[in-house]
Amino acid sequence: MSINSELSEITQLLHQDNYSCVVRNGVETQAFSRQGVQDLLSLYEERPEFLYNAMVADKVVGKGAAALMILGKVAGIYAAVISKPALDLLTEHNMYVKYD
């Protein structure tokens, strides 16, 4: 499955079920509802291997979330809203990013 089609699937989940963040790695998908970077930080601390090469769809990506995605070595990111500093940081690290 291509990065675009996988991101499209989890983006649909993000909006359809009103999650704040959806992460997919292979066949496993985890969806979160807390605001801010709490869920992403917990995932990075508890299961960093899950973020490796994962796809992430997030409602709001700021610089902190962007840094966690870089550290986790995610493969692709969709952001409904992204800050300029976050986009600059992700671009600097050659991360694949789609946003509205």
Role assignments for model-derived ranges:
Residues 2-80:
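Conserved mixed alpha/beta catalytic, RNA-binding, or beta-rich assembly cores of soluble enzyme
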Residues 72-75, 87-100:
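C-terminal binding/interaction regions
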Residues 81-86:
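Short, polar loop motifs at secondary-structure junctions
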